[in-house]
């Protein structure tokens, strides 16, 4: 049945994420915890319709500080910025990520290198 094939596909994708991204997920969690403990802030990129926006106002989850707005937000060293680009090639996202890394901001990127190839 279609629903069974769907569940199998989802389970396969989740297994791949667990097996290939586990360490990165823990690293991202440590970046967030360290930023919060040291007075830093957590920002969400929102350049495109990114998955990082699912982290704002989610029932049962944390309510993050605010979305990043280039003209209104000054990120500083030790802050964390989440960005996303399905392909990892969205110019505005890549440029923002590099600029923030140069400023000492920790950047967590949601992307799919498999999709980008």
Q: What annotation goes with each model-predicted range?
A:
Residues 2, 24-27, 47:
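Short, contiguous, pocket-lining structural segments
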Residues 14-24, 81-90:
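Short, glycine-rich nucleotide/cofactor-binding loops
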Residues 11, 29, 33, 53-56:
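Predominant activation on well-ordered alpha-helical scaffold segments within soluble catalytic domains
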Residues 15, 30-34, 98:
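Surface-exposed alpha-helical segments enriched in charged/polar residues
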Residues 37, 41, 46-117:
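Glycine-rich phosphate-binding loops that contact phosphosugars or nucleotide phosphates
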Residues 20-37:
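A short, well-structured juxtamembrane/interface segment
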Residues 1-19:
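Generic N-terminal amphipathic, Lys/Arg-enriched alpha-helix
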Residues 3, 21-23, 60, 107:
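A short linear-motif detector with a strong N-terminal bias
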């Amino acid at each position: 049945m279609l629903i069974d094939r769907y569940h199998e596909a989802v389970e396969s994708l989740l297994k791949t994420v667990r097996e290939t991204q586990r360490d990165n997920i823990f690293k991202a969690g440590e970046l967030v915890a360290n930023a919060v403990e040291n007075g830093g802030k957590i920002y969400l990129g929102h350049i495109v319709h990114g998955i990082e926006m699912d982290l704002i106002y989610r029932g049962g989850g944390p309510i993050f500080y605010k979305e990043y707005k280039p003209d209104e937000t000054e990120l500083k060293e030790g802050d964390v910025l989440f960005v996303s680009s399905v392909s990892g090639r969205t110019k505005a996202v890549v440029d923002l990520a590099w600029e923030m890394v140069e400023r000492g901001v920790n950047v967590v990127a949601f992307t799919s290198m498999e999709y980008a190839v």
